[in-house]
């Protein structure tokens, strides 16, 4: 019983605070679009890690077999281009959120 009263008290306080804060947040749409753009650009982190792993694999492959350097390099460039598309999409969404919305 004690937990039920405690949780209902916390929930009532939370909803009371949100009823005051939420209308102010919704009117400040200019600031929220920058937060959304920042969250949209989180996709760039995976691209950086992926391209680092691609470069590492290419360097290891060329180190093991230097004769295949041209094929490994061309495959590495194609793979880096494919992984870069996620960062470009994230950047486009962030720019749209900042300048269009």
UniProtKB/Swiss-Prot annotation:
Assigned protein family: Belongs to the ATPase C chain family.
Localization (cell): Cell membrane
Q: How does it sit in the membrane?
A: Multi-pass membrane protein
Q: What does this protein do?
A: F(1)F(0) ATP synthase produces ATP from ADP in the presence of a proton or sodium gradient. F-type ATPases consist of two structural domains, F(1) containing the extramembraneous catalytic core and F(0) containing the membrane proton channel, linked together by a central stalk and a peripheral stalk. During catalysis, ATP synthesis in the catalytic domain of F(1) is coupled via a rotary mechanism of the central stalk subunits to proton translocation.
One Pfam family name from the record?
ATP-synt_C
Q: Which residues cross the membrane?
A: 35-55, 81-101
Site, Reversibly protonated during proton transport: residue positions? 84
Tell me the keywords, alphabetical order. Answer: ATP synthesis, Cell membrane, CF(0), Hydrogen ion transport, Ion transport, Lipid-binding, Membrane, Transmembrane, Transmembrane helix, Transport
- Which InterPro entries does the UniProt entry name for this protein? ATP_synth_F0_csu, ATP_synth_F0_csu_DDCD_BS, ATP_synth_F0_csu_sf, ATPase_proteolipid_c-like_dom, F/V-ATP_Csub_sf
Q: Name one GO cellular component term.
A: proton-transporting two-sector ATPase complex, proton-transporting domain
Decide whether keyword Nucleotide-binding is in the record. Answer: no
User: Zinc: is it a keyword of this entry?
Assistant: no
Assembly with partners or alone:
F-type ATPases have 2 components, F(1) - the catalytic core - and F(0) - the membrane proton channel. F(1) has five subunits: alpha(3), beta(3), gamma(1), delta(1), epsilon(1). F(0) has three main subunits: a(1), b(2) and c(10-14). The alpha and beta chains form an alternating ring which encloses part of the gamma chain. F(1) is attached to F(0) by a central stalk formed by the gamma and epsilon chains, while a peripheral stalk is formed by the delta and b chains.
Q: Which GO terms describe its molecular function?
A: lipid binding; proton-transporting ATP synthase activity, rotational mechanism
The record ties this protein, via HAMAP family, to: ATP_synth_c_bact
What's the protein called, per UniProt? ATP synthase subunit c
Which PROSITE patterns does the entry mention? ATPASE_C
